[in-house]
């Protein structure tokens, strides 16, 4: 927050927020590892006196394309290009994960190979997804020098256009599918990760998927699924761009995003 928003806060402000948003009917306690029935009884007793009031009314997010530029005395520019993605409960969430991985999920990804390795236009480039309950984002980050910024952004956009024309190569889809499944399985070997996974799933989706169901969902994603999703997502009229460092003019970025 800012000084202006923090100054008026009192202890009652925080207590009221707790009562409104931290309600027992909205609480999930996830437990993994070695535990007993007595442990579960203790947890239930511990939370039995938790109180809340009212009903959470959360306004659905309304995405608006935007351009954000901030001058900062740093050695490189940081760019984040984002598009509306899919939610945590969308049928397309597995295809979205694979799309993100193919484009910018590591050193063998399209953007890393094209923008960094083959053309040397950036220090780093990768993609990431930000799924929420009712919406989501697919974002592309790159860190680079101001002198290569235009070329890099233009190349990134051309790579997206090419992908929307032809979709993924069979070996790309196969590699990223296996990476996603392997990462999932290895993550569940850690009891802490398993606890977070089941808790988040139950809280946000109201169910915990079996690992076999998740693996099968990845196996059922086709190249056409990813291509159709990419064509829906990479709509330049819906693109948002944030630049921190020594940004160019707004007109320059708007022209590139046309």
Regions found by a protein language model. Give the residues of each.
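Short amphipathic alpha-helix segments
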Residues: 110-118
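Charge-rich, well-structured scaffold segments of protease-associated domains
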Residues: 1-54, 87, 117-258
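His/Glu-based metal-binding/catalytic segments typifying zinc-dependent metallopeptidases
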Residues: 55-110, 247
